[in-house]
Regions:
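Intrinsically disordered, low-complexity protein-interaction/activation regions
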Residues: 21-263, 269-304
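Membrane-proximal extracellular "stem/stalk" segments
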Residues: 1-14
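Short, low-complexity patches enriched in S/T/P/G
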Residues: 11-23
Length: 304
């Protein structure tokens, strides 16, 4: 009676064995195909610009996790190579201005700066021969520095000099700033905090006073204030302590910003800190009087 079952077991064993290896082979094949697809999409994604600039920034991470391949333009100008070494000292005063002039314009408009405009800014009043010699020498020096740091090129295209960075390898705070600022109406608290972190290093190129830079500085100051105030007035702003930080930051750019004062006083009041709110108002009206030589036209109760 036990004979037939044994025969069944004996005959079914190789079937199960081959089926097992068939499924294993299919699993490996699916895994390889899936891995290849993920890798392809990842590489493709890195080279296709997103339609939503704020999606390019991860809100749960700091803007720069290390100084490797990093350029800071907010606060003091600093540039770090791939090993995190500060190479700012390699730039002489003229090379620094040349680099910053090309960098700011390249990041801002993607084209760089027209050659004749570059000559006019840096070597105005010199003979054509002198300009040509100075440009040639300093461009060669700049190229030499850039060749040592990789993933950055000095190019001339259609009469424009420009710097081209591979942002997969480089962090440039001004580039990240522009990504954020383009979507100012859509920013949530996480992205506002990224902008806050970025700008906390200081005003844009704060220790540099080139005449050509004034326009950029004014534009950035106005944009930062506008973005923070737009957010502070939006329905997304519900953290009074963060609103106080925003107001204080705006005061760094405009110490008599009425909007910042109102935001700060109301946020302090909502936290039950009424005496601090009144003190903030008193400081504001004192500064207002000193700057405009007239009294502010509202009292504390009107703005709360």
């Amino acid at each position: 009676m036990e004979g037939p079952p044994l025969e069944v077991l004996k005959s079914s064993s190789p079937v199960k064995h081959s089926t097992f290896w068939l499924f294993m082979g299919l699993a490996v094949l699916v895994g390889l195909l899936t891995g290849g697809l993920v890798l392809y999409l990842h590489r493709r994604k890195r080279h296709i610009p997103t339609d939503d600039p704020i999606k390019a920034l991860e809100p749960d991470k700091k803007l720069s996790v290390s100084n490797s391949n990093t350029i800071f333009l907010f606060g003091d100008f600093q540039i770090f190579d791939r090993d995190g070494a500060d190479i700012t000292k390699l730039f002489t005063p003229l090379l620094k201005e040349l680099f910053l002039l090309l960098l700011v314009n390249s990041v801002k408009n993607g084209r760089g700066l027209y050659a004749e405009k570059l000559d006019e800014i840096l070597w105005f009043g010199r003979s054509e021969q002198s300009v040509r010699n100075n440009r040639s020498v300093n461009m060669a020096k700049l190229k030499s520095i850039l060749e040592s740091i990789e993933h950055c090129q000095l190019l001339k295209e259609a009469g424009y000099w420009k710097l081209e960075f591979d942002y997969d390898f480089w962090y440039v705070d001004y580039h990240s700033y522009l990504d954020l600022i383009q979507a100012k109406e859509k920013l949530d608290e996480q992205h506002i905090r990224l902008l806050f972190e970025l700008a906390q290093r200081g005003n844009f190129l704060s220790n540099h006073n080139y005449e050509w830079l004034d326009q950029f500085k004014a534009e950035i100051s106005n944009e930062v204030i506008d973005v923070f105030l737009i957010y502070a007035h939006s329905a997304k702003a519900h953290n009074p302590e963060f609103l106080i930080q925003i107001a204080n930051f705006v005061f760094n750019f405009d110490q008599v910003s009425e909007e910042a004062m109102i935001i700060k006083c109301r946020a302090l009041s909502s936290l039950g800190k009424h005496s601090l709110a009144k003190k903030a108002f008193d400081v504001f009206i004192k500064d207002y009087r000193l700057i405009y030589n007239e009294d502010f036209n509202k009292n504390f109760n009107e703005i709360i």
